[in-house]
């Protein structure tokens, strides 16, 4: 795929891409499950056989990002390893094995006049995915849209441009082998930032939904400017509340994993809340464990009182998605205090409680208004793959259509099929 350089060419290029994607969506929406699975099998093989080329392209992207002063968390999101490429190919195979949502009859009923009505899942059409540093999004979005019968236009960040081109070539190879239109998975072949604005315009009806994957500024721009529906979350200010009735060993494991497994992912915990009754027996060992794991802790006066290494938290810390090995910590008055804090400062993404008290857990799960709420489990399970969706195209925190991990099923809509035998309305 040849990249263009002249901005004057861009509207023409993008218009052509959208038109080709729309035409491909018509074919893909009618493709059989077997044909889509054939493409997915070929994509997984292509990713594995081209791993060296993918890693070489990624190494160039990482070198440029490092030279440009990128943070450690950003570099982690950008970097591919042999293991991550293998995981990417494995993810394609997992999507291959999930049920095809297209054509599934979700409801059927008969009216008194004899008509039978069916509610049937259908593709959305053309999905535009705008993402930044994570090259694996290219594969995840491509294969999920394929499985759900949607064409997709991928616009990756300039930092991951080479990596995405290498991955996209593998996806196109799979489409070709399965005799599906190559425009079903399209990568915008330019770094020109104006391409984002054109996608947000909806391309004169060429795009049905937009999914942004990236930092707060990108998502905020998409939500403000998009002229088509958006599946997105603005940020992941996620909390772990450790109740006074928590098991300490479990709390340590959950808190450390929630924050430190991969601090830069959107499911990482950013704030630790601890029941006031557990300041001595629970809070102190949790803070020590976090600091020893290399995490900076910023806390209120109660948290500072248990360890002199804790830095003072500013008001802004409670609303911050660090994306790094930093966590804010606060003592709260029980489950109610935790819920109040999350209501004021949370982003309705993912929040967890650690407790052995089932009534307290039930209250937290019922009252915290987030897309994902967990009991005695890490916030880093906020992932479509962990939900059994095969992969995810993103996590949505809105309340219309899709909420939580957006997998293949969430990338479909529905229509009604009505069967009659000559009925007319009186």
UniProtKB/Swiss-Prot annotation:
PROSITE patterns: PROA. Pathway: Amino-acid biosynthesis; L-proline biosynthesis; L-glutamate 5-semialdehyde from L-glutamate: step 2/2. GO terms for cellular component: cytoplasm. It catalyses: L-glutamate 5-semialdehyde + phosphate + NADP(+) = L-glutamyl 5-phosphate + NADPH + H(+). Signal peptide: none annotated. It holds the Pfam family Aldedh. Disulfide bonds: none annotated. InterPro entries: Ald_DH/histidinol_DH (IPR016161), Ald_DH_C (IPR016163), Ald_DH_N (IPR016162), Aldehyde_DH_dom (IPR015590), G-glutamylP_reductase_CS (IPR020593), Glu-5-SA_DH (IPR012134), GPR_dom (IPR000965). Its EC number is 1.2.1.41. GO terms for molecular function: glutamate-5-semialdehyde dehydrogenase activity; NADP binding. Keywords: Amino-acid biosynthesis, Cytoplasm, NADP, Oxidoreductase, Proline biosynthesis. One of its GO terms (biological process) is L-proline biosynthetic process. It is found in: Cytoplasm. NCBIfam families: PRK00197.1, proA. HAMAP family: ProA. PANTHER family: DELTA-1-PYRROLINE-5-CARBOXYLATE SYNTHASE, GLUTAMATE SEMIALDEHYDE DEHYDROGENASE. Catalyzes the NADPH-dependent reduction of L-glutamate 5-phosphate into L-glutamate 5-semialdehyde and phosphate. The product spontaneously undergoes cyclization to form 1-pyrroline-5-carboxylate. Belongs to the gamma-glutamyl phosphate reductase family. This is Gamma-glutamyl phosphate reductase. It comes from Nitrobacter winogradskyi (strain ATCC 25391 / DSM 10237 / CIP 104748 / NCIMB 11846 / Nb-255). The gene is proA.
């Amino acid at each position: 795929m040849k990249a263009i350089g002249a901005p004057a060419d861009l509207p023409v290029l993008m218009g052509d891409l959208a038109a080709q994607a729309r035409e491909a969506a018509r074919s893909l929406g009618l493709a059989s499950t077997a044909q889509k699975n054939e493409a997915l099998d070929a994509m997984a093989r292509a990713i594995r056989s081209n791993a060296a080329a993918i890693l070489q392209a990624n190494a160039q992207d990482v070198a440029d990002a490092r030279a440009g002063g990128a943070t450690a968390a950003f570099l982690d999101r950008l970097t591919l390893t042999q293991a991550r490429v293998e995981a990417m190919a494995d993810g394609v195979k997992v999507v291959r094995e999930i049920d095809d949502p297209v054509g599934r009859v979700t409801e059927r009923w008969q009216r008194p006049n004899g008509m039978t009505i069916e509610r049937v899942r259908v593709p959305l059409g053309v999905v535009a995915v705008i993402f930044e540093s994570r090259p694996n999004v290219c594969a995840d979005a491509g294969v999920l849209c394929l499985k759900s019968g949607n064409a997709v236009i991928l616009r990756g960040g300039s930092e991951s441009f080479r990596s995405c081109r290498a991955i996209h070539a593998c996806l196109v190879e799979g489409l070709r082998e399965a005799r599906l239109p190559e425009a079903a998975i399209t990568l915008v072949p330019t770094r020109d930032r104006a391409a984002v604005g054109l996608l947000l315009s909806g391309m004169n009806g060429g795009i049905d939904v937009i999914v942004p994957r990236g930092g707060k500024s990108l998502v905020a721009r998409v939500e403000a400017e998009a002229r088509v529906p958006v599946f997105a979350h603005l940020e992941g200010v996620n909390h772990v509340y450790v109740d006074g009735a928590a098991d300490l060993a479990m709390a340590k494991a959950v808190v450390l994993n929630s924050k430190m497994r991969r601090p830069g992912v959107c499911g990482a915990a950013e704030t630790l809340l601890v029941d006031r009754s557990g300041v001595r027996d629970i809070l102190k060992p949790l803070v020590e464990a976090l600091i020893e794991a290399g995490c900076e802790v910023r806390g209120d006066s109660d948290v500072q009182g248990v360890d002199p290494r804790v830095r003072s938290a500013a008001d802004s810390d409670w609303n911050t998605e660090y994306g790094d090995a930093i966590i804010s910590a606060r003592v709260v008055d029980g489950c109610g205090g935790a819920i109040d804090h999350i209501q004021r400062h949370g982003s309705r993404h993912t929040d967890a409680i650690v407790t052995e008290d089932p009534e307290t857990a039930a209250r937290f799960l019922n009252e915290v208004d987030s897309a994902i709420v967990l009991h005695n489990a890490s916030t880093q399970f906020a992932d479509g793959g962990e939900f059994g969706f095969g992969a995810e195209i993103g996590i949505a925190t809105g309340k219309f259509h899709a909420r939580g991990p957006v997998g293949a099923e969430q990338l479909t809509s529905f229509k009604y099929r009505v069967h009659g035998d000559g009925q007319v309305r009186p």
